[in-house]
Amino acid sequence: MPDLLPLFVNLAGRRAVLVGGGPVAAGKLTQLVDAGAEVVVVSPDVCPDIARGGAPIERRPFRADDLDGAWLVVAAATPEVNREVAKAAEERRIFVNAVDDPANATAFLSGVIRRDGVTVAISTNGDAPGLTSLLREAMDALLPHDIGRWMEEARRVREAWKRDHVPMGARKPLLLETLNDLYHREREVSQP
């Protein structure tokens, strides 16, 4: 598989189709709803978490026309259904996350950390979801708990640079210096 392009997608208000009704599909539903997608679930049967998930449910087998108007589809059903969904998505040029089937996927939902305006995503290209989860937990522990303050400072400095027309090439070293100063000030305050 070629290297994947990490990409953050704005799904707010856009149609996403989730095919499948089990616990794995429920986890994907949560991710899609949290992203603001207008999710439609297609599955003859659904687990309680999907039933409570707030998305409309089409309680029937998948049909290719379920993908009409979709920006993204998640196939989280049986391997046979997932292949059918992936084929229909490919024909319509819609990205598909085919659970446990990286060969038929054109998109992967990554392990995600969201904290105070900062988002970190981790992927193993669909080959090792367990490792993705472990890496997400490790990265979460490494991120400063007050990263929101770092984000505020970076935003403030960026706006000032835009206003003052600071050249792009000069910004990175200046930002690193600013954030290092913030980090060291906070360490001095927190040490007895």
Question: Where are these predicted regions, by residue range?
Answer:
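A structured beta-alpha segment of the ubiquitous adenosine-cofactor-binding alpha/beta core
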Residues: 60-66, 79
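Short, ordered loop/turn segments at secondary-structure junctions
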Residues: 44-46, 62, 100-104, 125-126
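A short, aliphatic-rich alpha-helical micro-motif
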Residues: 11, 66-68
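Short basic, glycine-rich beta-strand/loop surfaces that mediate nucleic-acid
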Residues: 71-77, 107-126
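Hydrophobic, well-ordered beta-alpha structural blocks that scaffold small-molecule cofactor pockets
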Residues: 1-45, 50-53, 57-60
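Residue-level detector of alpha-helix initiation sites
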Residues: 23-24, 80, 126
